[in-house]
Amino acid sequence: MASLESKLADAGISKDEVEGVGIGVPGPVKNDSVVCECVNLGWGTFDVAETLSEKIGLPVKVGNDANVAALGEMWKGGGQGCQNGVMVTLGTGVGGGIIINGSIVGGVHGAGGEIGHMKVSETETETCGCGKRGCLEQYASATGIVRLTKQRLAADDAKTSLRSLPEVTAKDVFDAAKAGDTVAQELVEEVGRILGGALGSIAVVIDPEMFVIGGGVSRAGQILLDAVQKHFKERVFKSCQETKFVLASLGNDAGMYGCAKMIFNKN
């Protein structure tokens, strides 16, 4: 409460002028209110919105952080003006958010939009952080790309600049591909095949207007988008082949904008 009052004072705004408070949390959220076990914060299942609203005397809405970021990007970011879109965040893991008619699709259990845990391989032997095998996150995240690279380098002795690096990063792979390294280009193609195929599967279900790609891996830029779009088009109906792919633009502010939009949507 003290922190909220301090922020209002800094902005020269009275509490009466505030429509509500939006919060993004790293975990499933039901009914814009109940957090269903937020492991990263050490929370069990409880009604965050009701608890906080009683303390501050304002309406409170809660959303999954990835979903909230997606809402922000569709409102004021790379997907500005889009009412039906999907955001994919490629970082240490793979996150996502689905926006339909301008609102978050959270699902019955609050787990909607967990794109990173779509199964994309039946032959994977290593386990994902979620405990399953063959998740998209194991291939399209920054750590997944590094894993694929190490496997590729161990498979043969093909000449590549990546071998000279003490610790390969996803950025190294994309930079090498841009510089003409054949092995790196093959790796980018593989990431594009897997991610493009996964997004194609999403498209045949919800037919979004666009996909917004964010997270650290998205800094690779057009070389990533080109690889993804190529394989996306191979997976979808002809009418969906012109679905837009854009880069996210809000960075860490996406969640802030999304939290505000949650409140405006409800009011």
Q: Where are the regions that the model predicts?
A:
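Short beta-strand scaffold segments in enzyme catalytic cores
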Residues: 95-99
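Active-site glycine-centered loops adjacent to acidic/histidine catalytic or metal-binding residues
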Residues: 65, 91, 259
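Structural signature of FAD isoalloxazine-binding scaffolds in flavoprotein oxidoreductases
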Residues: 111-115
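Two-metal-ion RNase H-like nuclease active-site motif
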Residues: 85-88
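ATP-binding/phosphotransfer module of carbohydrate and carboxylate kinases, centering on a glycine-rich
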Residues: 1-20, 29-34, 50-60, 72-82, ...
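Short glycine-enriched, charge-decorated loop/helix-capping segments at active-site entrances
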Residues: 35-42
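A cytosolic small-molecule/anion-sensing beta-strand core signal
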Residues: 25, 31, 64, 100-101
